[in-house]
């Protein structure tokens, strides 16, 4: 029976011709299937995270076109996802508009923050601050330091829940936690910093026990608490910062534009050095950390 049939004894030309015939049968059968529908949803959180992605690419490669893509997209978001005084979860809807959820607001606030850090345009910082005020008013949980997924103004048919587990997308609360920590620095507002730290403390034990489900939380904890980078606030246009020869790796120093100081202010974690007026003095302060 095996004579001429066992594939181990067939020559390559014969075997390949049989294989092509079988593939054609499978291909013809596949073409008869109904194709899947195309997902054309335009969702606020996805677009806001793409803004942040464009900014990160710009920071890595230094391409101005990536920054322009981020600016164009944030303009489109403000045009299509904002109707009057309401932010929308989706740009298009069938009957009634769907109000934005916590992940939409959190991702948009963080996108504004990253735009401010890159452009020094204080308009973005104020827009982020306005969103955080709204979140505190409409999404705060009555008992936890975390925030509910839906607004208090939302349809009560939507289940109340607190989303904390990171998956393909970072959880809404972890994104918000990072936004609070950034805005605590940018606005010199201790309340925001305390909010972010309280959120971390409520999740940390679970995150350590199940790290695969809390990846973004653990990244934030590492970058902000366990191994914080040096944060340098500067006034003006930051002339001389880019080319200065620091005593530490540039990746460990984050330069932050500020319209609230007139000198340089270096902070690491909870500690801030005395304000100084030259980069050389900042470098001496950094040397004390080594």
Predicted features along the sequence, with ranges:
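Glycan-recognition and catalytic cores of secretory/periplasmic carbohydrate-active enzymes
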Residues: 1-290
